[in-house]
């Protein structure tokens, strides 16, 4: 079952967001377990929403550990972090939950 992680990152400034994002896009491909999909949404001048889908909850948990280390390394740029996770549900037409 696919498992998703969504992380809202709020930065101290626009410059902090840009600095963090540029470091992140260079860092994650070589350090985070393989993802099914990954997207980012800039929700304001000083915040972004990171969304990743993994093949399993176990892979997502491994990714969480690695990503949190990156967040710690870049903490000087961060104001706040909110993280959510759970199984990925289909939103296709007529999708039924069992």
Where does each model-flagged region fall?
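Short S/T/G/P-rich N-terminal loop/turn motif that feeds into the first structured element of a domain
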Residues: 1-69, 76-98
């Amino acid at each position: 079952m696919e498992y998703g992680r969504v992380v809202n990152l709020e930065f101290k400034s626009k410059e902090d967001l840009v600095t963090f994002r540029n470091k992140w896009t260079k860092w994650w491909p070589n350090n985070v377990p393989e993802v099914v999909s990954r997207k980012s949404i800039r929700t304001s001048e000083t915040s972004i929403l990171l969304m990743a889908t993994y093949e399993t909850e176990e892979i997502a948990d491994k990714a969480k550990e690695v990503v949190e280390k990156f967040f710690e390394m870049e903490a000087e740029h961060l104001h706040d972090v909110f993280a959510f996770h759970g199984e990925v549900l289909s939103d296709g037409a007529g999708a039924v939950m069992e």
